[in-house]
């Protein structure tokens, strides 16, 4: 059987706890008590000498102690029935045939129902506000810049841009080999500009810089005066 001593009756100080001092009957009728439906059921069972009460007995106890519930009975009575059915701390006890008069089964506390004590603090049957638990931070994923590899952090884009030209000159894998030199029979266009025939055949780019004598004769200096060692290097 459930030990009713765990729920001292003197903790149900209805008149003092439910309403402010000096409250009128009208205020009590309009003010909803600060008790949950589970607490109201527990109070009704606790006040019974046998430790059990019928559903109608629960209704009578609530309306007798709390005038607020005397109106709109259908709504809160449905809530009482739902809490009795869904809460494992309340069990239904059938009537004994031939020995008890009346209708309906009894309701009492389930044996070893210590979890009901956790619903209230120090015998206080008032409503408890829901406490918000600490926010749990999910596992942090890789940042937008890319995950850090085992070899170390990746270099910033600016550094990669500076290193790209140097690494290209070192012969990265997959690059094509350098072009082979032109055969000796064909002169490279760059070498052609420095040949003697090209210099003699091209017009003078700076005719104003010629000496007066050469400008009048329209001739070029002799080839032996030209430093040919520039083309033999």
Curated annotation (Swiss-Prot):
SUPFAM superfamilies: Winged helix' DNA-binding domain (SSF46785)
Superkingdom of origin: Eukaryota
Main subcellular location: nucleus
Statement: the UniProt record of this protein carries the keyword Transcription: yes
Pro residues composition-biased segments: 175-184
Pfam families registered for this protein in UniProt: Forkhead
GO CC terms, sorted: nucleus
Bias-annotated ranges (Basic residues): 125-134
Molecular function via GO: DNA-binding transcription factor activity, RNA polymerase II-specific; RNA polymerase II cis-regulatory region sequence-specific DNA binding
DNA-binding region (UniProt annotation): 32-130
Subcellular location: Nucleus
Sequence segments annotated as region (Disordered): 125-198
UniProt keywords, alphabetically: DNA-binding, Nucleus, Transcription
A biological process from GO: cell differentiation
Composition-biased stretches (Basic and acidic residues): 185-194
Function according to Swiss-Prot or TrEMBL: Probable transcriptional regulator.
Protein name in the entry: Forkhead box protein L3
Record organism: Homo sapiens (Human)
């Amino acid at each position: 059987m459930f030990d009713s001593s765990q729920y001292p009756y003197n903790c149900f100080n209805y008149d003092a706890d439910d309403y402010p001092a000096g409250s009128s009957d009208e205020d009590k009728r309009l003010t909803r008590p600060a008790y949950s439906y589970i607490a109201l059921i527990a109070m009704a069972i606790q006040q019974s000498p046998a430790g059990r009460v019928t559903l109608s007995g629960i209704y009578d106890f609530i309306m007798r102690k709390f005038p607020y519930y005397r109106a709109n009975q259908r709504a809160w009575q449905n809530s009482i029935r739902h809490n009795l059915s869904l809460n494992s701390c309340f069990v239904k006890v059938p009537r004994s045939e031939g020995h008890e008069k009346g209708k309906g089964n009894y309701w009492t506390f389930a044996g070893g129902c210590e979890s009901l004590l956790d619903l209230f603090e120090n015998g206080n049957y008032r409503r408890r506000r829901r406490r918000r638990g600490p926010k749990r931070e999910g596992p942090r994923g890789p940042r937008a810049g890319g995950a850090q590899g085992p070899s170390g952090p990746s270099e910033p884009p600016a550094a990669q841009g500076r290193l790209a030209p140097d690494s290209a000159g070192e012969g990265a894998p997959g690059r094509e080999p350098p072009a082979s030199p032109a055969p000796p029979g064909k002169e490279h266009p760059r070498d052609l500009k420095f040949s003697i025939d090209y210099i003699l055949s091209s017009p003078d780019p700076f005719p104003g810089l010629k000496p007066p004598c050469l400008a009048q004769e329209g001739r070029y200096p002799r080839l032996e005066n030209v430093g040919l060692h520039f083309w033999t290097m």
